[in-house]
Amino acid sequence: SVHPTAANCCRNLEYAPGTSASSIEYGTDTTRAIMGIAFNGDAVRFPDIRFIWSHAGGSVPFLADRIDRAGNRAKEALPNGFSAELKKFYYDVAGAANRGALVSLLELVETSQIVFGTDFPPGGTSSDVARDLADTGLFSESDLRAIDRENAVSLFPRFA
């Protein structure tokens, strides 16, 4: 799983009193990492690596169409386009178990590519995240079971 940090340029920024750079920078750093892996051709060169991106992929699901249009100029690295590469990845729900984040993600990938994750303690307990996922109204009971365990087992069958 690829987890972000606050970029060196932004570690000391105080976006609002009492908040940390992580509130904005973790999602932005995830976006930078996904774009780097895709646009430098690594996702195409190493198709057997199963990337799991934290926080529902940061802002990538929301910006995918916009980035895809920019990626049209990167045909060598992205012969099938940026969105095609995004559809190969997996995404966890740590810090993103809310309707706003998940609607964009579900427009990009199937539920089978979403795995459970938490950012405990700041993101709440596993129970908190499970409740928040259910409260979005976006998932059936079977989807919630898949996100909770089954999708991870399909990625890592030896842990079944």
Where are these regions (language model features)?
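Mid-to-C-terminal alpha-helical segments outside catalytic/metal-binding sites
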Residues: 40-41, 49, 59, 90, ...
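Catalytic pocket-lining loop regions of alpha/beta-barrel enzymes
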Residues: 1-115
